[in-house]
Amino acid sequence: MNAVTDLKQDYLVADINLAGWGRKEIAIAETEMPGLMAIRDEFAAAQPLKGARIAGSLHMTIQTAVLIETLKALGADVRWASCNIFSTQDHAAAAIAAGGTPVFAFKGESLKEYWDFTHRIFDWADGGTPNMILDDGGDATLLLHLGARAEKDQSVIAKATSEEETYLFAAIKEKLAKDPSWYSRNLAAIRGVTEETTTGVHRLYQMAQKGELRFPAINVNDSVTKSKFDNLYGCRESLVDGIKRATDVMIAGKVAIVAGYGDVGKGSAQALRALSAQVWVTEIDPICALQAAMEGYRVVTMDYAAEHGDIFVTCTGNYHVITHDHMAKMKDQAIVCNIGHFDNEIDIASIEKYEWDEIKPQVDHVKFPDGKKLIILAKGRLVNLGCATGHPSYVMSSSFANQTIAQIELWQERDSGKYPVGVYTLPKHLDEKVARLQLRKLNAQLTELTEQQAAYIGVKKEGPYKADHYRY
């Protein structure tokens, strides 16, 4: 990929001439994103994000373009990079760059370019710093915290344990050589972060528990209208889209192994079963395993499943769920892919020594010593974004409405003391608001409680209707 940067412009995209195409698709997406567009309309006049300078690290797709333009419509200044080397839609990036937003993203970035671009979202053209982060997976948040630690003690970036860390540590060392206080200066300016996904939320809670987190964070992922919709219904549609575009495989009759039965795993299993695959599930959590069994899925271990499966999908957010030994046991032509956030769910590093034959972008044949070949999709990264275009606009509207509300909440309350350093979730009434806005598109008719009914169950007539501990 020969990415293009115009020296007169503060962006780096694959081809700025794709902007017209991107703009047309953005216009279509807006009609499918009722919640996000309603929030844009509601708050545009008040400009609740005026003064906010948001460093965004999230998949640079058409749907994200609508989010970026919503943040700007509400008064924010924005700089953007993708949170995945394969997830950018180049026409979306071009449209956003052509509209005047600094964006650094193209499909097929190298890891060196990825960390360069993540640094660039913190380098404002006027020499200033951002004051907010909008993150997906936690890389932007990690970068500042780790870099600030390395300013004091470079031993924290001395020993890389993965290819990803090798490039991250090298990027931090290079930045420190040029500007020894760059990370702490940017870190001190951040007033809060909103985090999109399960993996990033895990990182935030770990940092908070260790006392390492330096600013307040809102966990957008655990808003009901995010995790129970984006993670479940989004994956239910985009997983098979990615597998089909990549391989044209017939799903029916195949044994499909779904590793993990959280919301992402549930949606993935539903999608594969809907196309008549025989779905097996692996799980560590007895509650999730029981849910899978009660839905009629066979619950097995990966050690057992490895030699039987035709299609393998990891959905755990964990490390080395599929190991080299598992892949060595798999059938010839088995399809292996991941719909969790990072590529280390599958031990890709252990098979890099073998012969790789690229069939087409993000589809590789990997030849094992015994002559067997596996089909590896998106090099173990997100299959739905690497091999297709990710979740549909409608379901992303829920997620991005929550992101926008969370950015407004943190920015408006930045000096109030409401959010000391820690990890928070949005209140139930805002979750319900997003759901109401989304329902308009579906021509749904909500039943209204009478005053007597509301009193009987002990809620307000206008909601919220469930306690915070309620499990949807």
From Swiss-Prot:
Q: Extract one GO molecular function annotation from the record.
A: adenosylhomocysteinase activity
Co-factor: note: Binds 1 NAD(+) per subunit.
Compartments reported by the entry: Cytoplasm
TM regions (residue ranges): none
Pathway in which the depicted protein is active = Amino-acid biosynthesis; L-homocysteine biosynthesis; L-homocysteine from S-adenosyl-L-homocysteine: step 1/1
Q: What is its EC number?
A: 3.13.2.1
UniProt xrefs under InterPro entries? Adenosylhomocyst_ase-like_sf, Adenosylhomocysteinase-like, Ado_hCys_hydrolase_NAD-bd, NAD(P)-bd_dom_sf, S-Ado-L-homoCys_hydrolase_CS
Recorded catalytic activity of this chain's protein: S-adenosyl-L-homocysteine + H2O = L-homocysteine + adenosine
The UniProt family comment states: Belongs to the adenosylhomocysteinase family.
What protein am I looking at? Adenosylhomocysteinase
Q: Which organism is it from?
A: Cupriavidus necator (strain ATCC 17699 / DSM 428 / KCTC 22496 / NCIMB 10442 / H16 / Stanier 337)
